[in-house]
Regions:
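Short, solvent-exposed loop/helix junctions and linker helices
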Residues: 1, 16, 23, 50-54, ...
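N-terminal auxiliary segments of SAM/dcSAM-dependent transferases
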Residues: 1-77
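A general structural signal for well-ordered alpha-helical segments in protein cores
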Residues: 7, 26-27, 54-57, 67-70, ...
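SAM-dependent Rossmann-like transferase core, predominantly class I methyltransferases
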Residues: 43-45, 55-113, 117-157, 164-176, ...
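Basic polycationic patches enriched in arginine
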Residues: 112, 123, 128, 217-220, ...
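S-adenosylmethionine
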Residues: 155-160, 164-216, 223-224, 233-339
């Protein structure tokens, strides 16, 4: 069978199973199987595929037709131009989340430049020649695969990233992604800010199959981290970024099969109104932000006004800004911890 005919049959089977983007997925699966890219595929579509390739290809098509996400079959997802490992233990990084990373990175880069300039102006020419811009401490809360924290560490110079998640399995994947992308990140395990309070650092080499009672398997145990600081002093950050669970519980049943049946419910369910995690984060984040520190949150398409009110009602943050995606829908909210008057 010619490669062109093989892929066309794969596309037909995926379309029949209700898979969106069946054409793209049929090609991606062939490229994954054979190790070629789509340019090479295009140039060689008239070549004959051997029987072994046909059988292996249709097994992948069968798996995708059962609505297993493409990324769970290939084991990877591109995000911000970097490759990330994914598994059923983490939410697959979405293109929409790149807006959060882009806005956070822009703020860090601009802040670094303005802070360095202000210090140079204050201290004179000699200081300008030999001083370094400040290092920023960033917390990636509910880090999942680590896509946000790893991307920020790749894009921004002189930042120190801490990433936390309640799932040890997710942290194991995030640790692999940090190593894969050659960035240093400190991983801590716990429920939102409880991870920062306890200072329990997660070994990023921990076994992805580890259970919830400890590192388990071949993974290593938790050990005290620098987050404990001295005495009872709390670690504070220049920026907290988070893409927490924000889907209404009643909406989960109508999600695509790939999402509701194959991605971790822990990363999806935001409670009855989808705002449970935001309430907790907004209520506590000011205790972990430095004066003037930034809070960036990814939000649902219709949650902007609810988040704006929630933030303003605390009286602890600046007037929040709602950032929209290309379709004009709510996507990110950002605000700053108020500085003392």
């Amino acid at each position: 069978m010619k490669t062109r005919v093989l892929i066309k049959e794969g596309e037909y089977r995926l379309s029949k199973a209700g898979v969106m983007d069946a054409h793209i997925d049929s090609e991606e699966l062939y490229c994954f199987l054979t190790g070629c890219d789509r340019v090479v595929l295009f140039l060689n579509k008239e070549q004959e595929a051997d029987k072994e390739t046909e059988e292996a290809y249709f097994k992948l098509i069968e798996k995708r037709a059962a609505r297993v996400p493409l990324q769970h079959i290939t084991g990877t997802q591109e995000f911000m131009g970097f490759e990330f490992k994914v598994s059923p233990d983490v939410l697959i990084p979405r293109q929409e989340t790149e807006i959060l990373v882009t806005e956070a990175a822009r703020t860090l880069i601009e802040g670094r430049k303005s802070a360095a300039h202000a210090k140079a102006q204050k201290r004179g020419k000699l200081f300008r020649m030999f001083s370094s811009p400040p290092e920023y401490d960033v917390l990636d809360l509910c880090c999942g695969s680590g896509a946000i924290g790893v991307s920020l560490a790749k894009i921004c110079e002189d930042i120190s990233v801490t990433a936390s998640d309640i799932s040890k399995k997710a942290l194991a994947i995030a640790g692999e992604n940090a190593r894969k992308n050659r960035v240093e990140i400190e991983f801590v395990c716990g429920d939102l800010f409880a991870a920062i309070k306890s200072g329990d650092q997660m070994d990023p080499k921990a076994d992805p199959a580890a259970g919830s009672s400890g590192a388990g398997g071949s993974g290593r145990p938790l050990w005290p981290s620098r987050l404990q600081g001295k005495g009872s002093r709390v670690q504070r950050f220049d920026m907290i970024v988070s893409n927490p669970p924000y889907i209404k519980r009643s909406s989960i049943a109508v999600l695509q099969e790939e999402v509701k049946s194959h991605e971790p419910m822990l990363a999806l369910d935001g409670g009855e109104d989808g705002l449970d995690y935001y309430r907790r984060i907004i209520d506590e984040a000011h205790d972990y932000l430095k004066s003037g520190g930034w809070l960036f949150l990814e939000i649902g398409f219709d949650q902007g006004e609810a988040l704006r009110k929630m933030i303003m009602d605390t009286g602890r943050y600046s007037v929040p800004e709602i950032i929209h995606d290309l379709a004009g829908r709510d996507r990110v909210v950002k605000c700053r911890k108020k500085k003392p008057e």
